[in-house]
Amino acid sequence: MTRDQVTQLVLDSKRRKQLKWAQLAEATGQSKEWTAAALLGQMTLSAAQAGAVGRLLDLPADAVDGLQVVPYKGSLPTAVPTDPLIYRFYELINVYGTSIKELIHEEFGDGIMSAIDFSMDISREADPKGDRVRIVLNGKFLPYRMY
C-alpha cells in the first residue's frame, strides 16, 4: 500500500468517524500539528503510535505498517498550489520570504531555521472583526559553518 493510499484511508476514516486531529494526537502522544503532518504522509510513526491510530481509525494492517515507513518528505506537487489556503502560504513566502530571510540573518547570522528540530502551534485568536488564525513556527537556528 502506498503512502498516498494510507493517507486517503486515514482521511476517509477520520471523516466517517467525525474525529478531530486533536483526538488523533491523543492516540499518538504528540501535538495535533505533528500528528496531522504524520498522518498526511510527512512523518514516521512508531509501532505503538501506528497501532493506536490504526485501532482508532479501524485501519487494515498494511496501512498501519505504512504509517511506520519513513516517507519521502516534501512530496507535495511542485506546481503552484491551487488550494486557496495552501496558496496563501505560497503567497506569504513570495511576499515576505526575503524579509524573513534578512531578519533571521540580521538576528542570527548566516544559516537556516531547522524544519527538523522544529515545532508548530496553530490556534484561534478571537477578534471583534473576525477570528484570526495564529501560527507559531519554532525552529532551531542552524548556522552554516566554514570548512
Swiss-Prot record:
Its EC number is 4.2.1.104. SUPFAM superfamilies: Cyanase C-terminal domain (SSF55234), lambda repressor-like DNA-binding domains (SSF47413). It catalyses: cyanate + hydrogencarbonate + 3 H(+) = NH4(+) + 2 CO2. Keywords: Lyase. Coiled coil: none annotated. Pfam families: Cyanate_lyase, CYNS_N. InterPro entries: Cyanase, Cyanate_lyase_C, Cyanate_lyase_C_sf, CYNS_N, Lambda_DNA-bd_dom_sf. One of its GO terms (molecular function) is cyanate hydratase activity. One of its GO terms (biological process) is cyanate metabolic process. The active site is at R88, E91, S114. Belongs to the cyanase family. Catalyzes the reaction of cyanate with bicarbonate to produce ammonia and carbon dioxide. HAMAP family: Cyanate_hydrat. This is Cyanate hydratase.
